[in-house]
């Protein structure tokens, strides 16, 4: 696990128009960063830029990983992405969680319990086969499956894009208590939140300051 990633001079664009300019993000292991701002301001595009290195949606001028300059192509593998539009595969629940990697069953069960997925595991089992469109599961269940997959990926940094969009308030709070109190490193786009929730993050980036 890397200790620190600094991204400086981040610009985000859409259809040739700059949305955000000159953002700096310092990501330190174990820290939690919230990203706020109005709808359509470029928050999700910012996340996509980090995982894709797509020059058509923006650029990052300077990238420093553990004190050494690196290229954008060197950092995409550091991130695991979980969004408000979860993607599932036409395969077993186990494969959707692990993507075929060798992960101990207890580790998978522990993450499922932390993310309120243990009820699905008890009811359907890990051999339950999902359809590609998620038929038979709620939006909240699909979102939690994708989030669990991201956590189990063991990627150093999670990118969380409005993961609570389809969660009820109790599940949302349970999951966030787990995330806030974990040793996970993540950047999270938050839209509907209480002001007091911000104290659970080590840094808050309001993209309105960079538009």
What kind of feature is each model-predicted range?
Residues 5, 20-22:
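Conserved structural motif at the start of ABC-family nucleotide-binding domains
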Residues 26-29, 74:
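Conserved hydrophobic segment flanking the Walker A/P-loop of ABC-type ATPase nucleotide-binding domains
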Residues 36-38:
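The feature captures the beta-strand-to-loop junction immediately N-terminal to the Walker
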Residues 44:
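Walker A/P-loop
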Residues 50-52:
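Helix-to-loop junction immediately C-terminal to a conserved catalytic motif
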Residues 61-78, 131, 173:
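ABC ATPase NBD Q-loop/coupling interface
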Residues 86-129:
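Conserved "ABC signature" C-loop
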Residues 96, 129-211:
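ABC-family ATPase nucleotide-binding domain "signature/switch" substructure
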